[in-house]
Amino acid sequence: MANKVKYGLSNCYYAVYDETAGTYGTPVAMPGAVNLSLDQEGDTNKFRADNIDYYVSISNNGYSGDLELALVPDSFRTDVMGETVDSTSGLQYEVADANPKAFALLFQFEGDDHATRHVLYYCKASRPTLASQTTEETIEPVTETINLTATAIIKTVGGASKPLVKAKCKPTDTAYSTFFTAVQLPAAT
């Protein structure tokens, strides 16, 4: 049965992409996923002739938006954002000229019939927000947000190079059971 609706966000992971080897590291959990909101990027171009839209082209430039977490894990800050932990003092510090690494983002949406697992293959992130507030009569958690850009990455699929942006699978698909143990790539067209 197909889902009629989707809701929820869980099982959020990142997997660092090795630009030289063209491979992904093992996915690392990012617990505390609150919200994922990504807008499509791209343009629609219309060529007018004969008083009609004679030719229409649509570009797919991926997605951009926000991932909100209870707290951004320290592992993400070091693995992806380039923060460093001082071996003597234990201080974890941010370096102004650090170059964030590319990564795959894996996550799951629930549905009325089944969960659907998603992967964005080539993401870049900006530094997380830094904020908090005083405690009043009740404790109100303050979340952290990462701005994301997800674009295409060239991978071989069925013997041909294809610009992959994202993929998804449902429980009946072969990739589902091992989805969060390694970044799943399509094998054939």
Where do the PLM segments sit?
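Repeat-unit-sized solenoid/scaffold elements
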Residues: M1-V5, V80-E83, E94-Q108, T134-T149, ...
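Solvent-exposed edge beta-strands and adjacent loop segments
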Residues: A2-R77, A125-T143
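Short linear sequence motifs
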Residues: Y7, Q40, F47, A96, ...
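Serine/threonine-rich low-complexity intrinsically disordered regions
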Residues: D18, D43, D86, T172-D173
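Short amphipathic beta-strand/extended segments with alternating polar/hydrophobic composition
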Residues: G25-P31, R117-C123, L164-K170
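Structured, beta-strand-rich domain cores
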Residues: Y55-S57, N61-Y121
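Mixed-charge, glycine-accented linear interaction segment located at domain edges/termini
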Residues: A125-T189
